[in-house]
Amino acid sequence: VSDVRGTSVAAIADGVRAGKLRARDVTEAYLDRIARLDPALGCYLLVDAAGARGRADAVDAARAAGRDPGPLAGVPIGIKDIFVTRGLETTCASKILRGFVPPFESTVTQRLADAGAVALGKLNMDEFAMGSSNENSARGPVRNPWSLAHVPGGSSGGSAAAVAASLCAGATGTDTGGSIRQPAAFCGVSGIKPTYGRVSRYGVIAFASSLDHPGSFGRSVDDVAALLEVMAGHDPLDATSIPAPVGRYREACRAGREGRQEGRVAGQGLAGVRIGVPDEYFQPGMDAEVEAAVRAALDELGRAGAKLVPVSLPHTKYAIATYYLICTAEASSNLARYDGVRFGYRTKDAHSLEELYARTRGEGFGLEPKRRIMLGTYVLRAGYYEAYYGKALRARRKLADDFAAAFTQCDAIVTPTSPIPAFRFGERLGDPLQMYLADVLTVAPNLAGVPALAQSCGFTKGGLPVGLQIIGPPLGEEICFRVGAAYEARTEWHRRLPPDPAGLAAGAPEVAS
């Protein structure tokens, strides 16, 4: 295997399962790319080369022995450093968890391993998943493969950038307010935030428990679907896990591409599908090139047979305030467990228990987790709880009701993923409000718990990707994949590859075959 740039999950898995590829050769090709290119990008916090080789050899041995190597046989994946991995350091990109080696495995990573996937290492992220630019990592930022001067988005910036740069074929991520979809849009790849409870949170380090959604990244919608089929499903170890059968996500992609259902015309994979377009997601202040690309994508979906219908999500204007009240309140509770006593970083020479707590947390947490802990503690104070947190919970219900009403009129809702393309490093770091507003179009699906898929739908004149967001009803991942695959079947945006870091200054983007 000489060149794995742009190789799909299916191409690798099918090749390994058929004996045309060796998992070990594929793994070595990706490890070589990581060694050569990741110093310029910063996607990986830890590369588990020995472990990856061992896992690849096990896949090859299983096939040679006539055993099923799994649906993701030999597929090299990256793991966001928020998923605990037994025997492998897990830090959430924070100093306070430096040296923490979990004694157990997350459900998601275990399911991927059982399916034959080869984990290459742990991916960089915003500290404790708090951020929209990957500038908050205690280990340094991730750079966008399309322009090293621009952010990759966050918090799953390492995952999105690694997939875009072909440093893995797919990756895991988590999405609390847009942390899969926004970096997918900024890096020109695909990513899904499934329905809340569709994918187990067991072994996912908590930020805001009622908002955290594990999901997947891939170069295409098909890649994302293949990973999610393995990751999804009921888990008795997660009290919020939904006991519902896993959808046929890859079949939904095929239906969108081919329009094979009865009565459909070839190329009309969305015949009969109603797509809602909410005015609230196209407000003044949106980048003109972003809006133009998304409007063009909507037109393309219409040509694929979909009917575009106007819908209203009237409480969208309250989504950002509601989100940041709830997520900071939950974060202040979840992060109270990091005290220097049981695991992770511990300050030196503390003379009392109170000093141990205060100095450990002061030295171990970065600025953004401290900011959110303080905000959350404030809104949960006696006398303020009802005025802030209680009101936010009622607003959350209103937002969920908006989606429920909209889905009586349409099958899926399509919007921009972000009102802007990727911004430059440092451009918003000193202004928390502007940074938080980068999530304005992604937080509402988290508050409502509905699935949402992001994919590439164009590029700015400056060569930066633009993202499309497809939102489905609860447990409606299949309609998201069908719409996304129908769009990819009619366009080539998902095939464009960023040049390797050494050549970023010159040359047009390449197109994968």
Language-model segments: what does each one mean?
Residues 193-297, 315, 350-359, 489-512:
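A short helix-breaking turn/cap at a secondary-structure junction
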Residues 71-108:
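Enzymes and membrane/adaptor proteins characterized by extended Gly/Ser/Thr/Asp/Glu-rich
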Residues 19, 30, 74, 114, ...:
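Glycine-rich, small-residue loops and helix-cap segments
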Residues 12-18, 78, 96-101, 212-219, ...:
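Short, well-ordered beta-strand elements within core beta-sheets of diverse protein domains
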Residues 37-41, 85-94, 423-425, 478:
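Cytochrome P450 core scaffold surrounding the K-helix E-X-X-R motif
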Residues 1-53, 57, 299, 303-305, ...:
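An N-terminal boundary/leader segment
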Residues 50-60, 116-117, 126:
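Long amphipathic alpha-helix in the N-terminal Rossmann-like dinucleotide-binding domain
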Residues 104-236, 446-467:
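Short glycine/serine-rich loop segments
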